[in-house]
Amino acid sequence: GILLNVSCGSGSLFEPDKRNALRAPSYPLISVDPYTSVWSFADELNADVTRHWTGKEQALLGVVDVDGVSYRFMGKETPEEGASVRFATAARQLSVNVLPTQTYYTFECGPVLLDVVFTAPLLLDDLDRMSMPVNYISWQVRSADQKKHEVRVSVEAFSSLAVNTEDQAVMV
């Protein structure tokens, strides 16, 4: 199964140690093993559905609600999937930065900035941690206009993440 640990916080976690000008052919989001591997094939995280490294759709959807307005920061909703959140506004991606174990994104979502970090703790000096099938999605929200805002972040995983072919049944 997939364990998705989502955390909120503040601090240097959201600021990469190094910046690069890499324009990658795809961006790693979740990389547990060859079978559990989710990537963004688009330069903008919300321009296409997320995919397995083979190109097969493995949809994740990320939405941030700011003062009652929804902004999609990850994935692209397709009508037949019937996501629980409907929205019209795509967040504006300001940056993406890929490092060996982390991918950093920053988005403008109306009056707030959203920082999202995808972390794969695949460090060879800690084999216990490396053997755990866990990746992390962390985020922080910062006010761009120095005012307080009501914010809610949600991440949704679609059934395409759990099956090999579209005709396979998913038990809930």
Each language-model region and where it sits:
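Accessory carbohydrate-recognition regions in carbohydrate-active enzymes
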Residues: 13-172
